Regions:
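Small-aliphatic-rich amphipathic alpha-helix that forms the alpha element of a beta-alpha
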Residues: 65-69, 110, 123-166
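Short, solvent-exposed amphipathic alpha-helical segments in soluble enzyme
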Residues: 96-99, 126-128, 169-170
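A glycine-rich helix N-cap at a beta->alpha junction
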Residues: 100-105, 109, 167-193
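Short, charged, solvent-exposed linker or helix-capping segments at domain edges/interfaces
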Residues: 92, 122, 191-193
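Short connector loops/turns at beta-strand edges and beta->alpha or beta->beta junctions
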Residues: 115-117
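N-terminal amphipathic, basic helical "cap/leader" segment at the start of enzyme domains
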Residues: 1-108
Length: 193
């Protein structure tokens, strides 16, 4: 057994206990009309930002949102790696095809890395890590928006001749894959949202 299977079994136990319990208990969180409106305003206003200013940001709330995101049976097979060193950001800006020429200006880049040992069913290995990463990045986008930070998803496309260097430089193991990256920073106010 591994940590992913342990998390899966704990998830199954929680789910079984929930199904045995009565729904609608006073502990169940509900939201006021005002809270609902605020949430949907955040959803409506969220947009991708590729223009950043040089200002350090605190992404602890974004990392918290990523940690609390839904994922395959709560296994947490996709995890974030924060890149903040200028040299590493410049390297990523050259390696990730979608980030060329702008991504290094973000204060932080979050790599979404999948540990393929988490995914047990061979039929799911080709898509499930990307679905999990999608849930994480949605939470990160909304957390960035409510924190007044710009955020943009960069697809995991790396040219074949650069993949080995990327894996080595950013410490990925043979059983790990990049599912994408998020560039996050204070956005340039002169650009319309």
């Amino acid at each position: 057994m591994d940590k992913y299977q342990d998390r899966y079994l704990a998830h199954q136990k929680r789910k079984a206990e929930l199904l045995k319990s009565s729904y609608g208990t006073p502990d169940f969180q509900t939201y006021s009309k005002e809270e609902q409106d605020t949430f949907f305003t955040v959803v409506k206003n969220r947009c991708s930002q590729r223009s950043f200013v040089s200002e350090e940001i605190d992404i602890s709330n974004i990392l918290y949102a990523i940690d609390r995101s839904p994922n395959s049976c709560d296994r947490k097979g996709v995890y974030p790696v924060v890149v903040s060193e200028r040299k590493d950001k410049e390297i990523l800006s050259g390696l990730l095809v979608g980030g060329v020429g702008w991504m290094h200006r973000a204060d932080k880049i979050i790599l979404l890395i999948a540990d393929m040992d988490c995914y047990k069913n061979p039929a799911e290995k080709g898509f499930m890590p990307y679905l999990d990463a999608g849930a994480l990045l949605t939470s990160a986008y909304l957390a960035a928006e409510v924190s007044n930070y710009g955020c943009c998803f960069v697809n995991p496309n790396i040219r074949d001749e650069n993949k080995e260097f990327f894996m080595s430089r950013f410490g990925l193991k043979d059983n790990e894959i990049l599912c994408g990256a998020l560039a996050i920073g204070k956005y340039e106010l002169k650009h319309t949202r």
